[in-house]
């Protein structure tokens, strides 16, 4: 059985862009602190601090040459690569170097889309065909990184070979073009993912150099781990909160001042237990069909019915070293079951892992996690 354990050593390596050719590796004794995280539908960060007095003259000289985006930071927990991404900022004081970096999705935030966004074709040979939203996301990334007028070289961030997909069972149609159908949406690729594809059911995260394009997990997916209260070091709180509960989710593009020609999408099942409990989402996005609105409603339904019970882990607490889960299994988005025996709520239910926050110093390692309610698999047909 896998256990979290306690890291015996952390190691940081500065690589050239692409993450494979080493530039510098501070000695373990010079590395005084490491923080890194993993998150879902956002860009994670890492920070290392190096004591100049223990780094040596040669290492110090190389550290002085570290350049944002020309170099990348790689973090190893014992021998396992746990985090990697481009350097964002280097700060030097009299006694230490601090290097801040962001994960590989930062490259997508720095690359502007130069391709038409019209995924309506039913021909599988057409790269821009109707398909799972995860496939559409990968195609958008691939078409922008493979080359083109403004590319310094094909796949210059070295991302395409590290994309992993977990496709949805429902096909999506996606279009973001002007009235002439030949206009390109000039925005960063990451904005396309966040503003258009995540609401339609995309869920992305990074592990090491890998970019995972997945879907929200449900109770139908297998659990990566099963935890109890003994798996946590410190206090925990159970919160049953109806603020975001719903048996039906509605999405509309209706304007308060003019409702002519508006459409809506609805997802869910009226509950005999809660009755009809609605949640309304308004979108100002243009050109959305009823199917598009249904996609957004479907993606937003997860975790609302039944009323979610959250597991809160106060700041400073984290997983115990005996927790039956490995760092490799702590991938944001996966299902993790928790049994809170001994609590009045008698909680035993599945969750989704939303964040992993790790801090290492000479005093030891702390691994914090955030767990959010998970939804049942959707049952129903599109409009």
PLM ranges: what are they?
Residues 66, 70-72, 182-186, 333:
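Glycine-centered loop/turn motifs
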Residues 36-57, 95-107, 251, 305-322, ...:
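Oligomerization/assembly interface segments of phage tail-like spikes and tubes
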Residues 63-68, 115-120, 228-232, 368-372, ...:
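Short intrinsically disordered coil segments
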Residues 93-96, 102-242:
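Charged- and aromatic-enriched interaction segments used to assemble
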Residues 52, 103-105, 208, 255, ...:
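A mature extracytoplasmic/lumenal domain signature
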Residues 1-130:
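Beta-strand-rich assembly/attachment modules of structural machines
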Residues 28, 74-102, 205-207, 337-370:
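Short beta-strand and beta-hairpin "edge-sheet" elements
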Residues 2-22, 118, 126, 130, ...:
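Acidic, small/polar-enriched beta strand-loop surface segments
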């Amino acid at each position: 059985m896998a256990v979290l354990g306690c890291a015996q050593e952390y190691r940081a390596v500065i690589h050239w862009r692409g993450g494979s050719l080493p530039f510098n590796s501070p000695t373990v004794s010079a590395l005084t602190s490491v923080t890194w995280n993993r998150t879902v539908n956002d860009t994670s960060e890492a920070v290392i601090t190096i004591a100049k007095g223990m780094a040596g003259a040669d290492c110090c000289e190389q550290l002085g040459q570290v350049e944002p985006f020309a170099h990348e930071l790689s973090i190893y927990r014992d021998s396992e690569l746990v985090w990697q991404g481009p350097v964002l900022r280097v700060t030097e004081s009299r006694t230490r170097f601090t290097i801040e970096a962001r994960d590989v999705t930062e490259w997508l935030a720095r690359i502007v889309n130069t391709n038409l966004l019209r995924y309506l074709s039913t021909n599988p040979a057409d790269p821009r065909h109707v398909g799972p939203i995860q496939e559409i996301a990968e195609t958008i990334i691939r078409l922008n990184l493979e080359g083109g007028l403004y590319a310094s070289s094909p796949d210059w961030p070295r991302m395409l070979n590290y994309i992993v997909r977990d496709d949805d069972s429902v096909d999506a149609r996606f279009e973001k073009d002007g009235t002439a159908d030949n206009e390109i949406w000039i925005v960063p690729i990451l904005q396309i993912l966040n503003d258009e594809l995540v609401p339609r059911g995309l869920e992305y995260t990074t592990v090491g150099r890998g970019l995972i394009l997945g879907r929200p997990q449900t109770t139908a997916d297998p659990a990566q781990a099963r935890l109890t209260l003994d798996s946590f070091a410190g206090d925990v709180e159970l919160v049953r909160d109806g603020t975001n509960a719903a048996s039906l989710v509605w999405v509309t593009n209706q304007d308060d001042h003019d409702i002519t020609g508006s459409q809506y999408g609805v997802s869910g099942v009226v509950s005999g237990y809660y009755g009809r409990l609605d949640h309304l989402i308004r979108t100002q996005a243009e050109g959305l069909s009823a199917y598009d609105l249904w996609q957004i409603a479907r993606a937003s339904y997860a975790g609302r019915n039944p009323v979610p019970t959250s597991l809160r882990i106060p700041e400073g607490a984290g997983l115990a070293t005996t927790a039956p889960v490995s760092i490799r299994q702590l991938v944001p988005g996966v299902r993790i079951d928790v049994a809170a025996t001994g609590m009045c709520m008698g909680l035993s239910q599945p969750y989704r892992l939303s964040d992993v926050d790790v801090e290492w110093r000479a005093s030891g390692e702390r691994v914090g996690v955030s767990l959010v309610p998970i939804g049942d698999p959707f049952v129903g047909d599109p409009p």
